[in-house]
């Protein structure tokens, strides 16, 4: 039986890798230069890959082999299970349904990437929206820009309604209850188990979040000269979705430190972080094929502005799509995105078959990027990389507060709360489209303690303004898991390898850290993720490390909030 499986998987891996490359090339073109021709190419390539991975004969043989899993090597079983998950994304038992989904996703991506936002009748780019919310303190102007950022929702909603039904239909072809259930199956979990895990994260971190929320609304009320609200108005926060609360802590605002830097310097410095740990330099093709900087003003080309890293051929062709500018946020983002690139490099080796050139689970990929982003914000590293002067005296509380606000704690309540629960309802409970915006804002209010500045009726679809809702659905819990995971890995590195406090440590040029990270990454998807985590850190997935990292901050917040009403109910 093992010999039969080996022969079968040799063919499957070869076909999968070849068609993955063709589809990725087409998707790259469609993302970096949004045109009808490139959209059509992406759609055609998607159909070709789906025809292979969802072939009924392939599905039958995969299932037949899995009936004998006890006779097969563990890595063989993992490949077969992954092949079946791939097949469930495009089962050719119903080719018309799969074709309709691919066509709908291509149209949705084109609408999303090609949308032009307007403010007072003039075009405004996503980067300009973000920069405005980061810097402007005029509340009426902020509200106008925030509302402009939601303009894409009504344009995207019809396509999203159609896609919800098509994705659920595709998932049900191979026996999954719905598309959300198919996605969480990649973790070996059910929808109920995944939602419970996310609820557990929020329950364990809620005392910290309530203190942070209370401190933040008082700070913002003072900034804007307004009464302290129960819930924070969304346009008070410097992020379109209130997922990260950035630029609140002046002592930790490093943007001025980047004024003499270039976007090229930011990416090269991120690469040097990894080479200092013992990783190789990025391949030359990374620099010649990536799309790293914003489209120049007046250029007619449109591109996807969401930062990402691509493994185009599951081999050596690694690229990144970014819009890097010289500021602290892009400094962090560049370190994060290259984390994906070095994950690709680490598991691209003969021992890891193409089907398993993935993270131990999807969150491991995000977690590795997030871990390096956390390390890139540590004061000792900022000094060693020349951003902060050697004599700089850090306000440790300010940096911890910024860590919590900008990168971690509100993000859990956005990702575990609003995003996960809304998509579980939309896909898992077939929530009627006439209730989508009401349910969205119910969750934003309940989980995040945030409310819109004006009435948001069903003529809007504010969830659809988030990229992932359209092109990476039923996935966002992975970012929450990644956030928890980054603190576990960071805690282990700081305490066990560096013998330094997790809140103030430096990975720079430490080959032990590099070996630890490579030991996780080079496995790809060849081992169960729970086993990988236990082997690396000695513990199961837990918010313990995250809670301990912010324990000094919690004590400070409790002191600051003494006498204030905590929470929003």
Task: Name each model-derived stretch.
Residues 180-181, 323, 344-371, 385:
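Post-HEXXH active-site segment of zinc metalloproteases
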């Amino acid at each position: 039986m093992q010999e039969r499986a080996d022969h079968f998987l040799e063919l499957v891996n070869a076909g999968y890798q070849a068609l993955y490359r063709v589809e990725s090339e087409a998707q790259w073109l469609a993302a970096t230069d949004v045109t009808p021709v490139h959209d059509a190419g992406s759609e055609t390539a998607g159909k070709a890959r789906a025809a292979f991975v969802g072939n009924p004969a392939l599905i039958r043989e995969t299932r037949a082999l899995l009936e004998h899993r006890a006779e097969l090597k563990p890595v063989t079983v993992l490949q077969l299970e992954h092949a079946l998950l791939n097949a469930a994304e495009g089962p050719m038992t119903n080719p018309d349904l799969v074709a309709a989904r691919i066509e709908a996703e291509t149209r949705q991506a084109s609408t999303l990437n090609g949308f032009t936002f307007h403010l007072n009748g003039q075009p405004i780019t996503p980067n300009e929206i973000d920069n405005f919310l980061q810097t402007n303190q005029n509340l009426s102007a902020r509200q106008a820009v925030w509302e402009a950022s939601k303009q894409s929702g009504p344009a995207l909603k019809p396509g999203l309604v159609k896609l919800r039904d098509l994705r659920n239909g595709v998932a049900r072809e191979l026996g999954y209850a719905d598309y959300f259930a198919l996605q969480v199956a990649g973790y070996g979990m059910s929808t109920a188990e995944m939602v419970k895990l996310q609820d557990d994260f929020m329950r364990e971190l809620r005392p910290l979040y309530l203190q942070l929320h209370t401190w933040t609304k008082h700070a913002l009320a003072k900034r804007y000269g307004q009464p302290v609200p129960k819930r924070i108005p969304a346009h008070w926060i410097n992020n379109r979705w209130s997922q990260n609360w950035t630029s609140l802590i002046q002592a930790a605002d490093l943007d001025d430190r980047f004024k003499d830097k270039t976007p090229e310097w930011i990416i090269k410095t991120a690469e040097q972080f990894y080479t200092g740990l013992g990783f190789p330099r990025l391949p030359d093709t990374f620099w010649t094929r990536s799309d790293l900087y914003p489209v120049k003003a007046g250029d007619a080309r449109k591109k996807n502005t969401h930062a990402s890293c691509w493994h185009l051929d599951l081999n050596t062709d690694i690229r990144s799509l970014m819009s890097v500018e010289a500021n602290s946020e892009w400094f962090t983002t560049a370190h994060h995105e290259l984390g994906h690139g070095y994950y690709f490099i680490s598991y691209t080796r003969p021992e890891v078959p193409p089907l398993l050139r993935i993270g131990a689970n999807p969150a491991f990929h995000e977690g590795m990027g997030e871990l390096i982003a956390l390390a890139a914000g540590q004061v000792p590293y900022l000094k060693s990389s020349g951003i902060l002067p050697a004599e700089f005296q850090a306000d440790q509380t300010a940096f911890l507060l910024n860590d919590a606000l900008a990168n971690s704690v509100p993000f859990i309540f956005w990702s575990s709360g609003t995003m996960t629960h809304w998509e579980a309802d939309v896909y898992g409970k077939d929530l009627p489209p006439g209730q989508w915006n009401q349910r969205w804002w119910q969750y934003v209010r309940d989980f995040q303690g945030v409310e819109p500045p004006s009435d948001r009726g069903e003529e809007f679809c504010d969830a659809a303004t988030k990229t992932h809702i359209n092109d990476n659905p039923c996935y966002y819990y992975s970012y929450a898991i990644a956030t928890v995971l980054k603190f576990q890995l960071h805690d282990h590195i700081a305490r066990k390898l560096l013998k330094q406090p997790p809140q103030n440590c430096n990975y720079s040029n430490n080959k032990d850290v590099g070996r630890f990270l490579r030991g996780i990454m080079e496995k790809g998807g060849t081992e169960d993720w729970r086993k990988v985590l236990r082997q690396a850190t000695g513990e199961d997935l837990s918010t313990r490390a995250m809670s301990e990292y912010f324990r000094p901050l919690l004590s400070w917040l409790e002191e600051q909030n003494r006498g204030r009403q905590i929470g929003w109910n």
